[in-house]
């Protein structure tokens, strides 16, 4: 009798995705981040569900309801901090996952890569809306500043902003709709993840060498299931350490003050994972230009496959490109630091230089390095 997991319509899908999936024999720990993102997503949906049971999306009670969760709900504090810090872990895994794709040339699977970019935008939108919900000072002013950026759109900008706000300022209507969207988006993300995996399984995984691995495949289970469980345990350990020892390490103290439309905080800044994009936005003195640079800083990923000049897929055997890649990582860390600094000398100049370098590396230097390396290899 044939095994049920190979015949049952539902079990067959799971089997072909997680058990009998042929996987390259040499994929490193950098390939763990996909499954870790799945763990993060499930964790966020579960903790978010329990938070939503006690949260109220009304401007008068939102802040108090979060306090109530932390003080009165059984283990409410750990659920709240797991959700808040889980978002940080989510973004750490996301950045590592995208970085892996850039380094090893995984972007040449264009459908998988493009669905990944859509996922990145959706996760960023979800995280932004979630940050508004506690209705602290930084929630309110962050929402005001970021939604206001849409007013830079010519002709329809001002109307668009009022339409999103549901009034003439960020108020009750805004909070309610942000809560509704924040609740539904993770399920949209879940559906997009299925599409992402569908496209990935059409081609199979890339591997560190960048050479097709069809001649050397191993079953996903038990080799990579055990490896993924190991990764998940390390992720949960890191998250637990963060939640139990320094839950407010990555947060903003301003968000412990209830939202007050009459008092602007001295430094408005988003969560740490948006700081690199925020720094790029701020480094351009023109409003529309800044907004375009902000969007393009993420959208640039979509044209990376078109800029691939090397005859090798990954950067494993390309020292010039490797240097540029790690320069890009250092540049992004610099931008993240600048995004959290006040708008004054020398931070403005550093931010502008780092922003120029970011676009230079991706649009100019990396394609040139690919051509140089081809010539060096006499190809």
Curated annotation (Swiss-Prot):
SUPFAM superfamilies: a domain/subunit of cytochrome bc1 complex (Ubiquinol-cytochrome c reductase), Transmembrane di-heme cytochromes
Protein's recorded name: Cytochrome b
Amino-acid positions noted as binding heme b b566 in the UniProt annotation, renumbered to this chain: 97, 196
UniProt: heme b b562 binding residues: 83, 182
Task of the protein: Component of the ubiquinol-cytochrome c reductase complex (complex III or cytochrome b-c1 complex) that is part of the mitochondrial respiratory chain. The b-c1 complex mediates electron transfer from ubiquinol to cytochrome c. Contributes to the generation of a proton gradient across the mitochondrial membrane that is then used for ATP synthesis.
Pfam families, per database record: Cytochrom_B_C, Cytochrome_B
Keywords attached to this entry: Electron transport, Heme, Iron, Membrane, Metal-binding, Mitochondrion, Mitochondrion inner membrane, Respiratory chain, Transmembrane, Transmembrane helix, Transport, Ubiquinone
Organism expressing this protein natively: Melursus ursinus (Sloth bear)
Cofactor: heme b
Gene that encodes it: MT-CYB
Protein family (similarity comment): Belongs to the cytochrome b family.
Signal peptide residues on this chain, from the entry's feature table: none
